Amino acid sequence: MSDARNLERLALDAVSAAEAAAIAASTLIGRGDKEAADQAAVDALRTGLNAMAMKGRIVIGEGERDEAPMLYIGEEVGTGEGPEIDIALDPLEGTSLTAKGMANALAVVSFAPRGGLLYAPDTYMDKIAVGAGLPAGVIDLDRSPSDNVKAIANAKGVSTEDICVCVLERERHEGIVADIRSVGARVMMLPDGDVNGVISTTIAATGIDMYVGQGGAPEGVLAATALRCVGGQMQARLFFRNDDERARAAKTGIVDLDRKYDLNELASRECLFVATGVTDGDLVDGVRRSKGKISTETLIMQSSGSIVRHIRTERPA
């Protein structure tokens, strides 16, 4: 059976697993305990993944085996029957957002055939991304943010003042923000959740033209699977703060520590991307409870055919 067909057969079960994680985390929205919210999502997602007919392996997860008791890198999930699948996940993207009752918290999981996702260490990653419909090579991580803004504006036939760039709100990004604004472009700051930021470039209604900045490498691979599904562009480079992080990268098999990865190296084969809203956000609505029922909204993307679906599910509370 083809890779695309295998992933298609897993899609609805993947949605169910992400929904379960989102619902579990939603019980802790606004309660100020991000660790408890994350653990609730982890427990529910792991249960859902283990019910799926696949030989699954976590390649992007909650950390190394000695750091995370569940959904650790290398953990095998699924029933043990079916296709060999690599999985990247973030059971609760936006733990702080959830704890504070803020927007854009998601339960996120991606699937690809074995070997189809970059085995990225849990370090930082410099990233730049745009959505579909732009000339190949329009962005370059080695150019300044302002030069990339100019290139995008030129490709779209608009002024740089019409370009909006999404950046995580971090002190380390102050120079990036200043450079973007120096050419008149607008900056939308995200308090947390750079998977959401990257994916926003693919959805016209968000008004986001480009994402740039430094965030987690695992989140970079997750976001890359979504972009691959819809034809966006992305470049990334691992960023190491110390020798321990370099050693961690070597352990995952990365040889060239300065390599600039393009989208097809981050996610090299057919992909399935699933994100269920925990709190209301730009991509999907959050979990809602009303009149004895629970409703969820899930964004699902498939690289085969560049298919994007929104699935709304209602179940008894």
Residue locations for each model-derived region?
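DPxDG-like acidic metal-binding loop motif
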Residues: 82-93, 97-118
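Catalytic-loop motifs flanking and including active-site residues across diverse enzymes
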Residues: 17, 21, 103, 218-222
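Flexible glycine-/small-residue-enriched beta->alpha junction loops
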Residues: 112-136, 140
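Short basic, glycine-rich beta-strand/loop surfaces that mediate nucleic-acid
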Residues: 77-78, 107-110, 207-211
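A short glycine/serine-rich beta->alpha loop
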Residues: 7-11, 32, 96, 135-137, ...
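N-terminal subdomain of lithium-sensitive/metallo-dependent phosphomonoesterases centered on the IMPase/IPPase/PAP
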Residues: 1-88, 147-150, 154, 195-196, ...
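An extended, acidic
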Residues: 143-293, 297-302
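Short acidic-aromatic active-site loops that bind/stabilize oxyanions
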Residues: 11, 15, 138, 142, ...
